[in-house]
């Protein structure tokens, strides 16, 4: 019998999480195995209120309460580190708590993970449900990160894989910055599945221009070496073609600013302590 861990980061989103758990309970019906949910509570200010009475297909729900708010990407890092520490062989699935990751598509990811044990199965976002402005901003982010890194990163947290892959996932601390970038950097075998991104269950999207810029910076700093090489060759090529002193100086300054900024951001924000120490306490709310 297979064991499954469903990892969900959450911050003040308990109403949505209740609906997600209800849908997950339906979605995994008929799948042979034991399903356990780990919720990483990112230091929510609202009182935890989860309804677990009718979740017959979910055997256990555990909440990891964090000492401070650190963001969903770092919360996922801690959740995966916790699973790695308890050394429990399983299939791990990751979803956001807001409902944008369709729980009824989870079975599709799990089935692929069962067949391809050495692969990380990720959900490529084939369609997004945000307004036109946010879709446009996200498109610019995709183009910008592709231009700088050479990587097309069109997936988020929604994924599934065997726990044996955690060793290569944690080859370094790249996952601390951004889950998708860390996976793409550390794992060669990635299976992409096209899945439509759904609307949030409740409330407005938290994504805005500031969020996208911050997230893009976290992604590109993971590929700092690739950025250095690509930008160096691009600047060199332009200098050789145009041979304009003023343009050359501007390009060199831009090259230095870009690479120094990326490197500095990585060094300042890099993990230099045991992330599991950020767990305040653990609480079982369903056994």
PLM-predicted stretches and their roles:
Residues 86-91:
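Short acidic donor-binding loop at the edge of a beta-strand
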Residues 41-50, 99-100:
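A conserved acidic beta->alpha catalytic loop
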Residues 33-43, 64-65:
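Short beta-strand/loop segment that forms part of the nucleotide-sugar
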Residues 66-68, 72-82, 94, 100-177, ...:
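Acceptor/aglycone-binding surface of glycosyltransferases and processive sugar-polymer synthases
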